[in-house]
Amino acid sequence: MIKGVLCAILVILCLSPLLAQEKIDLFGYYEAQYMGAKVKSNTYQLFTNKLRLDLKGQIADNITLAANINVLTYHGKTNWDVLEFLSDDIVSSIPEELRSLYVIPFENDIVLDNAYVRFRFKPFDLTVGKQQVSLGTGYVWNPTDVFNIKDPLDPTYEQPGHNALRGDVPLGSFHTATVLYSPEDNWRYSTKLLQFKGRMAHFDYYLIGVVRDWVFTDFTRFDAESMSFEATRERRQMLGASTAGELLGLGVWAEYAYNWMELSDDFYELVAGADYTFDFQTFVMVEYYRNTLGKSDYREYDLNDWMRYYAAEQKAISRDQLYAFAQHPVTDLLNLGLINITSFSDGSFAFVPTLFYSLSDNVEIYGYLNINFGKEGKAYSKSQGNGALIRVRVYF
């Protein structure tokens, strides 16, 4: 941890001549976050400190340099036992001597989240390094995004950077072609992406093809020699499309992707959504999500389904879900909202009241309560407990 802080200071010192010449801007934020959970008869708390430091500037006429470092510390309950959130029949199937392995740790860390250089040439732009790769038009779920998985309770939170070589080629005024290569240990499992963006009438759209490796962990099989769960690595090929625009006064979007798997069953994902703002400023949004990797009968949910979901190896555990959100500006500074997430597959749902308060131009407060409704074993079951989150962010 100390070594990481010293490295961050060294980077800033090395860039200080550019900072002095105002070629590089230094900015960021500090974030304090409290997360609490009531699970069965237990109450847990986790407090997080996060400092994000950003550097960005144009160091030449056609060259932009950008990077950010995140420093994180965790306090309180820093090891969460996943088995406390699962149904008794799943927990009872796990040997007693292995139950201590199903823990998600929160460890202090310093992360080089993004670090890239962008070259702007006349025929194309070239971006090299760890960069944002955000795909899709969906608000909560993105079938065509093979890089990121959003938290349904906090879908707008920033995503990590990904190491890649990316080229963007303008094809006239309304079209762009993008090629991306993200190297792994060999060519076969490295990510190759080709995307074509365009605009037609009131709609933006894109077509995309991706080849990428996918690791599925088998959380029922533990390898004592490597001290880890066994995992299967396979090749994933995806073709997809996405569109967003305006129709009859509504903002609408749709996204689809079909995945051909090397070893597992093929599957597809589909998103369709719409939003609208009334004259009295209330904003409403709905988004439907179908993922055939998920299951339509909650009695078929198994340990791997739950663990892969918690470990962000897959986007959903149930096949069909609906996200609904309404928000109203109570004052110029305060917005109150309500989220409802429903699993059509098993009938469970969650209510999530939200609050966003702008204390000043550079200070904001966000919070929510998470209340689950559903019988044990379902996607949003009461046995998973209820939770709360409060986040204060100060920009500089």
Task: Kindly label every feature range from the protein language model.
Residues 122-123, 149-299:
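Signature for the C-terminal beta-barrel architecture of outer-membrane proteins
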Residues 38-43, 78-83, 139-145, 189-193, ...:
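Outer-membrane beta-barrel translocator domains and adjoining extracellular loop/strand segments
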Residues 29-35, 70-72, 131-133, 182-184, ...:
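Outer-membrane beta-barrel pore domains and translocons
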Residues 24-30, 65-67, 126, 176-179, ...:
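Transmembrane beta-strands of outer-membrane beta-barrel proteins
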Residues 324-328, 357, 363-364, 368-371, ...:
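Outer-membrane beta-barrel "beta-signal"
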